[in-house]
Amino acid sequence: MAKDDVIEIDGNVVEALPNATFKVELDNKHVILCHIAGKMRMHYIKIMPGDRVKVELTPYSLDKGRITYRYK
């Protein structure tokens, strides 16, 4: 059930923070805070610094995002 108005962009995880929050450097060199999507938590997908991830941003808040996919 994805929303139509989200912005999807790729990035690299820079730092792991408490409470499943991560600093992610996007391809355009901006660094944002991201949390893990619920489906990724449910399936115990681990995110480590250095991983390449797909991030969803809303047009309302471009400094926070949600990690929806970890590339292999």
Curated annotation (Swiss-Prot):
Main location: cytoplasm
One Gene Ontology cellular component: cytosol
Signal peptide as annotated in the record: none
Gene3D superfamilies: Nucleic acid-binding proteins
Localization annotation: Cytoplasm
Family, as annotated: Belongs to the IF-1 family.
Protein name in UniProt: Translation initiation factor IF-1
Gene field: infA
